Each structure stands twice: as structure tokens, then as C-alpha cells.
Amino acid sequence: MKEIHNIIKEGYKFMKLEENKFRLDILIILDITSSMESFIEKFKEQFYPMLENIRKECPEALLYVGFIGYKDLNDLELGDDYINVDLTTDYEKINEIINNIEPDGGGDIPEDIAGAFELSLKKSWKANTKITFLITDSPCHGKEYHDLDQNQKEETDKYIDENPNGKKIKDVITDIFGKSISLFCLNLHKNTSKMFDKFKEIYEETKLFPSKNQFFIENNNFYDKEIITKIVDLYKKEK
């Protein structure tokens, strides 16, 4: 009887491994502060067609999608929690949440990207192909990550030494790469260019997996052929 139980147990493990091999995990991390309003309206129209295109190109994929909508530390202090949805196949649920977003808040120019990245590490990642997709027009906190005028700290970066209550963003990004999660970034504004250059440096320092698994695009269009091609190619390579 024990032998039969072990056979069933091993069979279940094999089935889960096979399922994970065909699974594709995509987590979208979106800045939902006031400055993102025009992009978010476009994003609402593009989100579902983007998923449909990925599913068309990878019909065998078990596509799981998660979502984090983040703002800034002062918004959290005011009780305005971030939107935080785990990886799921309930695309209608994600789509409804996205369509109900009303951008506001933000305070100073940088936003709490480090906090959003920390939340991303708690998602139920299981696929061989794991992608975190950051979309923002503002840099993270910290003087290393932007060239904003520091003579007006209250307006530019209230947390110039990063979040006093959380991890340094370098450590969080290293943790992301340590879980073999690919980082895709949509660069919407020149203010984020220095930050993305620093992310690339951190990525190269870790040397955890090939640099082709990190992807930056300067574009204001989420529903972009280049993005879809990159996701599909990565999935087919890692399946």
C-alpha cells in the first residue's frame, strides 16, 4: 500500500513539473500615480489584446498573470494601499481591476518601485519562464537613480537615501534575479533613464543568467510587437 502511495506521489510531482514547464508567469508592475493618467488610459485598451496575442503565439502555454499597481510611500502613510493581485488565470478579474484604476497621488517625483518589487517576490512564481514587467515614467527613490534637482528635496525626492523602512532597491533587484525572474521595463520618460542604466549594472554584477533575459524598451506603447516577440521567444527558449 505504501508503495502505491509513493508511486502516486511521484506521479503527481511529475505532473506538476510538466505543468510548470508549460506555464508562463507574467507580473505587471504599473505606476498608478497622477502623471501616468494618459498612459494608463491607453494601457486599459491594450492589456487584453496583449494577452490574446501572447496566447495566440503560444497556444500551449498556461498563462498566469499578476498585477501590482503602486504609488509612493506617502500614499501608504495615508492608508492608500497598493493594488496587489497574485498570479492567476482569471484574466477577466485582472482586466476589471485595471479598468477601475483612477490614477492619483505620488507626492514627489520618484515613486516606491522598491516596495513594488518587494511585493513581487511574494507572488506564487512556479513557471520556468517568469517575467516581471515594470511600467513607469518616474524613477525610484535614491540619489544614485536619478539626476533630479536636489536643491528642492521636498519636491524632487523626499527619500533621497531610499526607503528608511524597507530594503535597498539594489538588494531587491538582486533577489529578483536570484529567483531567475526576467525583468522587462517600459521606459516612458527621460527621468527613468539613469535608473534603468543602474538596473542594468546591478544585473551584470549578479551574472545569474544570460543578459538576454533582461529587456528595456523606450516606448509608450504596451501593445508592441517587439515586446510580444521578446516574451514569446523567451518562453519558447525556457520551456
Annotated model-derived regions:
Residues 1-239:
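Divalent cation-coordinating acidic motifs and surrounding scaffolds
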